[in-house]
């Protein structure tokens, strides 16, 4: 089978990218989705808060996904469900995608361009090295969310949550609304990993304690969780002896970070960012592999699905431009350097000759900063400065760069992003 464009993943990123590519003139494209339905993780996110930027109204996850699914179907975009991509390789300008499903078995698709939109997965207990037995009652927050919201099953009645990522915060509220008692949320870092609005709406409004600089050091119970031991940690994240506290519970939910799912990217030889665990991309969201683009949570973990859709639309448009022969490199790639509190930037390089008039650069900081400013500089010249009352790792930030400003700078070698405290 041959295709001009294949989108791997039928979640919010894959759908938005496919729609943008079709509207930009790509007729021969295909979405590959391993689940039994389109929509990705949004299908289990039945809470509201989606769509405020994209649709200017508040939607639930399934409602948000439904609008993109309807649009994709109205445009006649083909898709395959229950279809797993098991390998991705490059053969010159063509990309070879090895695919498997029940109806057609194992087969290969050759594509001129590929958009990576595989999303991310949760960090498991094994990756956290929590001591103790392995009893029933330990779940990732996303697994518990699927059980409650899609399958109508309650994971437990007395709950402790480790990690204050957005999924964990939302599940603290969800479990409470379903009748469970959420004893507390413990967070290893001295700050929350979630959005401020989720801390207020999901914890404060329900009087659920948030213990910062705490972690789980032991799990009690052999057949079923009977309790956990938490302890305060020092500045090196090591438990402090004598601070242990035993909490009775029958369920432990883990919300300890998300990891972009990039096994396929690795098999293709895509260059990866060690900070985000996602691909390094340029201003067109193209990886180091020609004709391979990345967007959404496979690129870097987002706070809001609206930003995923915006990013994916750009990837879809640029893939269309590539297929039409319009992405030939004309200038040199200018690296974007993250220093002084900025952990990374997306994109990681910009070819000014190929960038749009306005280029969005998204980034995260590595700590909590109050009364600070984000500075963007080129050749020791500040071209952008934004004052911020607060900057936190749990909130993605962005800066808009103007093509005209960058073109006016002589001998531009790199663009530096940094945090300056006032």
Task: Show where each model-derived region lies.
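FAD-binding core/adjacent interface of flavoenzyme oxidoreductases
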Residues: 1-8, 66-158, 234-242, 253, ...
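Beta1-alpha1 glycine-rich phosphate/pyrophosphate-binding loop at the start
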Residues: 3-8, 12-67, 71, 155-199, ...
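Predominantly flavin-linked oxidoreductase catalytic cores and closely associated redox partners
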Residues: 106-107, 113-210, 215-224, 291, ...
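Short, aromatic- and glycine-rich surface loops/edge beta-strands on solvent-exposed regions
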Residues: 374-376, 404-422
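FAD-site-proximal beta/loop scaffold in flavoenzymes
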Residues: 116, 138-148, 251-302
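A Rossmann-like FAD-binding core segment of flavoenzymes
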Residues: 72-99, 176-263, 357-389
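Mid-to-C-terminal Rossmann-like scaffold of FAD/NAD(P)H-dependent oxidoreductases
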Residues: 306, 314, 318-386
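Exposed aromatic-hydrophobic patches
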Residues: 362, 394-406
């Amino acid at each position: 089978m041959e295709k001009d464009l294949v989108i791997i993943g039928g979640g919010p990123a894959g759908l938005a990218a496919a729609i943008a590519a079709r509207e930009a003139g790509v007729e021969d494209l295909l979405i590959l989705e391993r689940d039994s339905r389109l929509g990705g993780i949004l299908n289990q996110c039945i809470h509201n808060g989606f769509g405020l930027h994209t649709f200017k109204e508040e939607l639930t996850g399934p409602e948000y996904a439904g609008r993109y699914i309807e649009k994709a179907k109205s445009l006649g975009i083909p898709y395959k469900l229950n279809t797993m991509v098991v390998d991705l390789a490059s053969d010159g300008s063509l990309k070879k995608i090895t695919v498997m499903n029940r109806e057609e078995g194992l087969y290969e698709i050759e594509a001129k361009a590929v958009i990576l939109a595989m999303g991310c997965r949760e960090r498991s207990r094994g990756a956290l090295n929590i001591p103790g037995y392995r009893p029933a009652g330990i779940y990732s927050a996303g697994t518990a969310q699927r059980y409650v919201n899609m399958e109508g099953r309650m994971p437990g009645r007395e709950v402790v949550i480790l990690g204050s990522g957005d999924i964990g915060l939302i599940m603290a509220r969800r479990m409470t609304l379903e009748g469970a008692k959420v004893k507390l949320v413990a967070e290893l870092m001295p700050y929350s990993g979630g959005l401020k609005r989720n801390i207020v709406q999901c914890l404060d409004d329900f009087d659920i304690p948030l213990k910062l600089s705490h972690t789980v050091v032991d799990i009690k119970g052999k057949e079923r969780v009977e309790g956990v031991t938490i302890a305060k940690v020092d500045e090196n994240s090591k438990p402090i002896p004598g601070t242990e506290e035993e909490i009775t519970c029958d369920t432990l939910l883990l919300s300890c970070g998300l990891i972009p799912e990039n096994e396929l990217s690795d098999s293709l030889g895509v260059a990866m960012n060690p900070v985000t665990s996602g691909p390094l991309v340029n201003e067109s969201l193209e990886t180091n592999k020609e004709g391979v683009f990345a967007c959404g949570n496979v690129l870097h973990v987002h706070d809001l699905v609206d930003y995923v859709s915006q990013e994916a639309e750009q990837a879809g448009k640029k893939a269309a431009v590539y297929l039409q022969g319009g992405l030939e490199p004309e200038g040199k790639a200018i690296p974007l350097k993250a220093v002084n509190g900025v952990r990374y930037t997306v994109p990681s390089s910009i070819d000014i000759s190929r960038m749009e008039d306005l280029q969005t650069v998204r980034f995260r900081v590595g700590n909590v900063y109050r009364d600070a400013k984000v500075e963007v500089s080129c050749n020791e010249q500040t071209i952008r400065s934004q004052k911020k009352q607060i900057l936190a790792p749990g909130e993605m930030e962005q800066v808009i760069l103007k093509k005209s400003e960058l073109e006016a700078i002589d001998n531009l070698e790199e663009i530096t992003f940094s945090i300056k405290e006032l």
